[in-house]
């Protein structure tokens, strides 16, 4: 990163964080480097696998827009999108914030090892030892090609903890306790390769916490992964790590979510990702007699209700903030997997709450893995009472869902008057104050433009997080806050809810205070007419340029009719937009 970036990042630090960063730097670049230099490299011979050796065997597992063949050896350092490869050197010295080696995200997605649960399930369902051999082959290959602290796969702690969680579920699926007693080859593999790997993951997780301005979903993942590992495996300082991780989860579920159950990172796609850490920890805790507090479950219940309210009738979410298509657990090997709907079923079972079970609720392999046959029985016993049919306002958190549902017809609008994001850098927030998103019959019409990328293509990153990429107003070609790095905002705006009624909400923000402009937006819903009135008030003592974009889903067709625009979808009613005649479109 540039010197300018470091200066800006330093501005976000408190004095305690400055001390922590020095300590962290010593850990990663002095202590870790010594460990790396002194570590002996494993040189295991790869076990035989008839599936790997079979040239005709193939199974394509989705990795974003690409696939990997999990019936073949895997290059653990290759970015399959760019076909560039990350170097095998000391992990903390690798620059992931350029495209020199490609995108670390694509490499990490493979190395989360989500596909191992799928392979383990194939073994469980078929009792075919070929699948067990394939599982052992991939884990052995990973350990051999990723020595401790070598390569990009030891760079980010969140990746370490997602692997820990998947190791836990693989262990359960394989019934590894029994296998270790009955299968000498597997027992040797566990003792010499898998268990030491788990130990190193737990140690890394414990010693590399994401604290202060970085204490967002990364910290939650670290507590969750370590908690699960400490519950299930015989790791060093097991009790100490378990208590540490459990206390951390109890604290962060309150700290990182509002009293209304809204995640404070202001990144909707991350909700399903973060929820899984809290959910999985809760279930593993119950199963191992390490239960969480009543307050933990109360907050998780609120989170579940917010999740239900923000989804339209087809399970689509309003794409405010960053999204990276990340998953914690993915035993279903499908490209188009809706973890939001899967989680609703999980929460309905966990809380035995029929108000969380929708008419289109699903029971999938993930829920079967989490709850088993008993959970499925609870799921089937619940009525489907969870399909929302009216508006729901989360006023204190700044999120407003306007909704009318009648049979298969649904009008859905999300109005965002929330803070920019969480902590001093608001890493995954977008400058989208007072923006809105419109879906009809579960079809997105007016949308958030999305995320695209984090650390590469800097100009596109700046656009997609910027104000112009959202359905709000940009003043003088400037964003509502200052983007100082790919995941770092300065000069955060404040939103104020000025008026709320049964069918309307009004809010303002001060993101253009430096421009001498104030912006207030009021959204009124007329359910009898299925229409909205959106009124913007811009006040200033001097001239200014205002841009008011409307971003459409790519499948929406547009016809101009006089001063109005007709938006047409093949799968829903049409939408007509009437603009102020004084505006130039």
Where are these predicted regions, by residue range?
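Aromatic-lined, polymer-binding surfaces characteristic
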Residues: 86-88, 93-97, 103-301, 316
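Carbohydrate-active enzyme catalytic cores, enriched for enzymes
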Residues: 266-446, 498-501, 506
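Beta-strand-rich N-terminal accessory domains
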Residues: 9, 13, 21, 33, ...
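CBM-like, beta-strand-rich accessory domains located in the C-terminal region of large
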Residues: 161, 323, 330-333, 348-364, ...
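Structured loops at beta-to-helix junctions and adjacent beta-edge loops in soluble globular domains
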Residues: 69, 77-81, 208, 323, ...
């Amino acid at each position: 990163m540039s010197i300018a970036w470091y200066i800006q990042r330093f501005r976000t630090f408190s004095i305690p964080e400055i001390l922590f960063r020095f300590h962290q730097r010593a850990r990663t670049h002095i202590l870790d480097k010594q460990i790396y230099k002194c570590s002996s490299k494993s040189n295991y011979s790869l076990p035989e696998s008839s599936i790997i050796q079979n040239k005709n065997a193939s199974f394509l597992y989705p990795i974003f827009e690409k696939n990997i063949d999990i019936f073949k050896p895997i290059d653990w350092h290759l970015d399959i999108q760019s076909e560039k490869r990350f170097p095998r050197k000391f992990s903390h010295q690798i620059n992931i914030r350029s495209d020199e080696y490609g995108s670390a995200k694509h490499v990490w997605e493979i190395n989360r090892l989500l596909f191992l649960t799928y392979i383990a399930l194939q073994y469980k369902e078929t009792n075919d030892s070929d699948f067990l051999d394939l599982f052992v082959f991939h884990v052995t290959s990973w350990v051999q090609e990723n020595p401790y602290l070598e390569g990009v796969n030891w760079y980010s702690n969140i990746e370490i903890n997602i692997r820990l969680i998947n190791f836990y579920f693989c262990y359960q699926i394989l019934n590894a306790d029994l296998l270790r007693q009955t299968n000498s080859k597997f027992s040797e593999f566990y003792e010499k390769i898998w268990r030491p790997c788990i130990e190193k993951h737990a140690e890394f997780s414990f010693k590399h916490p994401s604290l202060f301005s970085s204490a967002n979903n990364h910290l939650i993942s670290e507590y969750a992964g370590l908690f699960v590992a400490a519950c299930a495996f015989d790791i060093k300082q097991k009790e100490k790590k378990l208590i540490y991780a459990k206390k951390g989860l109890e604290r962060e579920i309150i700290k990182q979510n509002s009293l209304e159950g809204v995640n404070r990172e202001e990144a909707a796609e991350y909700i399903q990702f973060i929820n899984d850490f809290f959910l999985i920890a809760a279930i593993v805790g119950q199963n191992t007699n390490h239960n969480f507090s009543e307050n933990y479950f109360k907050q998780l219940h609120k989170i579940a209700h917010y999740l239900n309210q923000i989804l339209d009738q087809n399970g689509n979410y309003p794409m405010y903030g960053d999204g990276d298509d990340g998953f914690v657990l993915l035993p279903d090997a499908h490209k188009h997997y809706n973890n939001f709907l899967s989680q609703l079923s999980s929460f309905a079972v966990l809380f035995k709450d029929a108000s969380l079970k929708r008419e289109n609720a699903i029971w999938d392999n993930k829920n079967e893995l989490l709850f088993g046959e008993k959970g499925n029985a609870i799921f089937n016993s619940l009525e489907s009472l969870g399909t929302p049919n009216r508006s729901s306002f989360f006023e204190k958190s700044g999120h407003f869902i306007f909704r009318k549902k009648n049979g298969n017809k649904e009008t859905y609008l999300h109005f965002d008057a929330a803070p920019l994001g969480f902590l001093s850098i608001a890493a995954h927030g977008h400058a989208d104050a007072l923006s809105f998103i419109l879906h009809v019959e579960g079809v997105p019409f007016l949308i958030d433009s999305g995320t695209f990328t984090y650390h590469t293509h800097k100009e596109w990153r700046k656009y997609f997080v910027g104000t112009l990429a959202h359905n709000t107003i940009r003043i003088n070609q400037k964003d509502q806050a200052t983007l100082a790095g790919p995941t770092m905002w300065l000069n955060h705006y404040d939103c104020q809810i000025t008026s709320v009624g049964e069918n309307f909400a009004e809010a303002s923000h001060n993101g253009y205070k430096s421009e001498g402009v104030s912006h207030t937006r009021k959204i009124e819903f007329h359910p009898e007419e299925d229409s909205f009135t959106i009124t913007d008030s811009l006040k200033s003592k001097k001239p200014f340029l205002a841009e008011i974009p409307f971003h459409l889903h790519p499948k929406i067709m547009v016809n101009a009719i006089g001063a109005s625009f007709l938006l047409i979808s093949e799968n829903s009613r049409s939408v007509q937009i009437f603009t102020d005649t004084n505006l130039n479109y």
